[in-house]
Amino acid sequence: MKNSQCGRSMIEMLGVLAIIAVLSVGGIAGYSKAMEKWKINKAVEEYTMMITGLLEYTENLNKNYSEQNKYIANFISQAKLVPDTWKIINSLYIDDSFGNRLLPYIGKHSLTVDFYIMHDNNRQTSNFAYQLCMALALDVAYPVLINIDTGGLFINNDALPNNKSYTVYRSSCYESDGTKVKCISEINNADISKICKSCISRSRCNVGITWQ
């Protein structure tokens, strides 16, 4: 009888431990998901802060354009358009709070920020890259570019035919040479999701935002 009770107690204990293990895994997964969501929201907040600030400086930056001063990573840092957690890599690149790399530069009549979303072993997961690509298009680029006549959004898209590498959206719906492209006003969750899936298979995914 005692042996039977002992065996039953051991089985019950193992069952309890199994339940605890499952709950622990679920808790860790839930925490990871919540942390990833927090990072996305934080990145969107910081990107929006930077772009909103750059919009105020665009005209002056374009006036002072030259090949020698086309890259503006140092300017962005000195103008306090980004948090102190961002790091200047060199005159070309600046890294955000989560290790994603940005290349901001000006032209004679434009300002562009290229976002390189990283998800190698030292940075984020491929799902984070996908989610951040989505957020960049829907929560950062769209609210800004929908109100700008000359805005553009470029996203890596491995699924495109004819060796094209980017899906292009323009506020005007046309490139400067008259080529018809997607309209900023037509941006929607389903299309952006399909495009941003390219980020899952890449160690570095590129999203570009430009305006005049």
Label each residue range with its predicted role.
Residues 54-90:
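Short, glycine/small-hydrophobic-rich surface segments
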Residues 86-212:
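Intrinsically disordered, low-complexity regions enriched in Pro/Ser/Thr/Gly and acidic residues
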Residues 29-65:
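Membrane-proximal N-terminal amphipathic helix
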Residues 27, 43, 53, 89, ...:
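A general marker of short, structured functional hotspots
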Residues 1-35, 43:
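N-terminal single-pass transmembrane signal-anchor helix
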